[in-house]
């Protein structure tokens, strides 16, 4: 059965970027259609990404904390895991959140069309759904088509023992020996989960550190911890993958490469994601898509076709849900007639591992590359009463200041719940705060949060919780 719908705005894709754009359009009084290929809203993030991974990481954290407490006199015994119940818990979290989105769409009178949408012209999209074909004609469009995992031609991806992130999140089994290709955030988060559930985990990364975007001093602290969980093979890459009846055999080359192919029960390919710009027939609407699948936009999220905007993963790095949400708001507001722009000072990044790795603003290597006259100040959690009492004293808080203006331009945290502490640094950068503003703000004690204020005190030379390198020298 074929039907037609007319809308002021159509949003293609209902991930965080897409549903935020659609809901904002509706709130601004625009008749809005939201197209989604899944049966539920939320896209990759809610269904097979950010949210289910955090549910599983919560389980992993509880398991690891229970084991660690034995050293402090609280013995629970060896944790017994029921994979089916863990999976049900993860699915319950997804259902609760996607159901909530569905309810908000109805409340806002957003017309949700389920199926795969492709452009047929500059003002039309055809959606192929289980109930037939729907043609949506529109005045304005917002593309939020997202991204998908990268696949390599020499890997037999059709073998069920070769996983991408979606497969890993299904939690069908816990392999005895797991290889993770890629030392980025997704791979390390999944490695954290499967290690806690009992897998022997190897991680292969072609660069000289995991999470290559983060600064080396932060990753040095992180690596010291995770090396106890994973076998890290840095400066090493996979050259061949062969599926055999008794396992997946992987050949490698580089600094840590085994001499012979290594057998694994499963291999998680987590080497990044590719945008879906080439999968929506954008060219039929006159939209320019580059050879990688990205759609380029201006600061109002407009494509080269003025009434069509694009947001989220499909417009470029970083591929982060929170970036897409803000882009979605801008696109909706521009369509409604507001003169808004996407020009963020900060976009935070977080690896929800244990310990967490989080950074915002400029990294030290970025500041150096840009020729900024900067100074780094750090506060080691080994000097934090709360960190010591909470058994996480191996963390660190790092702040980067402009030496000329004393303004904070970046910051990073490695440690338990580091991502939850990052907000103050992001706000300080966005508001143009200097070191004195942060140092003179009274932070509660004892908290991990106060490490941010103490790092600012290090820069200011007013620190009393550490030896003060900037103290006035006195004659004996």
Summary of predicted features, one role per range:
Residues 50, 145-200, 204, 232, ...:
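Glycine-rich dinucleotide-binding loop and its adjacent helix/turn
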Residues 114, 290, 298-299, 364, ...:
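Short, acidic, Ser/Thr-enriched surface-loop or helix-capping motifs
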Residues 10-21, 26-38, 44, 51, ...:
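Flexible, glycine-rich terminal cap/loop adjacent to redox cofactors
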Residues 10-12, 117, 136-146, 181, ...:
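Short hydrophobic core segments
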Residues 13-16, 181-184, 313:
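Glycine-rich Rossmann-fold phosphate-binding loop(s) that bind the pyrophosphate
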Residues 158-175, 261-335:
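FAD-site-proximal beta/loop scaffold in flavoenzymes
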Residues 2-7, 17, 23-174, 207-211, ...:
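Glycine-rich flavin
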Residues 186-207, 231, 302-309, 315, ...:
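Active-site substrate-recognition segment that forms the wall
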């Amino acid at each position: 059965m074929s039907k037609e719908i007319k809308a002021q705005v159509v949003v293609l894709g209902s991930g965080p970027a897409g549903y935020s754009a659609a809901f904002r359009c509706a709130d601004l009084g625009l008749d809005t259609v939201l197209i989604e290929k899944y049966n539920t809203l939320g896209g990759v993030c809610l269904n097979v990404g950010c949210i289910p991974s955090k549910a599983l990481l919560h389980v992993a954290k509880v398991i690891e904390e229970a084991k660690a407490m034995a050293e402090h006199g609280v013995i629970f015994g060896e944790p017994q895991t029921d994979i089916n119940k863990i999976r049900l818990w993860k699915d319950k979290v997804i259902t609760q959140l996607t159901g909530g989105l569905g309810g908000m769409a109805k409340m806002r009178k957003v017309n949700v069309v389920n199926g795969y949408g492709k452009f047929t012209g500059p003002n039309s999209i055809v959606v192929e759904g289980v109930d037939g074909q729907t043609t949506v004609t529109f005045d304005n469009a917002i593309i939020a088509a997202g991204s998908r995992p990268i696949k390599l031609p020499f890997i037999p991806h059709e073998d069920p023992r070769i996983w991408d992130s979606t497969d890993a999140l299904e939690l069908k089994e816990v392999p005895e020996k797991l290889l993770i290709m890629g030392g980025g955030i997704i791979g390390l988060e999944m490695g954290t989960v499967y290690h806690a559930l009992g897998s022997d985990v190897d991680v292969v990364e072609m660069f000289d550190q995991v999470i290559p975007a983060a600064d080396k001093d932060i990753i040095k602290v992180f690596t010291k911890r995770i090396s106890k969980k994973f076998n890290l093979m840095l400066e090493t890459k996979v050259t061949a993958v062969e599926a055999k009846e008794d396992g997946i055999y992987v050949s490698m080359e580089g600094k840590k490469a085994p001499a012979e192919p290594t057998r694994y029960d499963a291999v998680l390919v987590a080497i990044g994601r590719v945008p879906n710009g080439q999968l929506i027939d954008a060219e039929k609407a006159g939209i320019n898509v580059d050879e990688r699948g990205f759609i380029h936009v201006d600061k109002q999220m407009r494509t080269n076709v003025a009434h069509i905007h694009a947001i989220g993963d499909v417009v470029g790095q970083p591929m982060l849900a929170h970036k897409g949400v803000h882009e979605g708001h801008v696109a909706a507001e521009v369509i409604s007639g507001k003169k808004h722009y996407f020009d963020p000072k900060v976009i935070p990044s977080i690896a929800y591992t244990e310990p967490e790795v989080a950074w915002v603003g400029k990294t030290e290597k970025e500041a150096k590359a840009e020729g900024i006259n900067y100074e780094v100040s750090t506060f080691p959690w080994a000097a934090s009463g709360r960190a010591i009492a909470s058994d996480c004293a191996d963390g660190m808080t790092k702040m980067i200041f402009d030496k000329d203006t004393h303004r904070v331009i970046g910051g990073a945290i490695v440690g338990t719940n580091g991502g939850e502490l990052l907000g103050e640094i992001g706000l300080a950068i966005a508001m143009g705060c200097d070191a004195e503003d942060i140092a003179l703000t009274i932070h509660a004690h004892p908290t991990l949060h106060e490490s941010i204020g103490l790092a600012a005190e290090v820069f200011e030379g007013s620190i009393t919780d550490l030896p003060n390198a900037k103290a006035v020298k006195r004659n004996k």
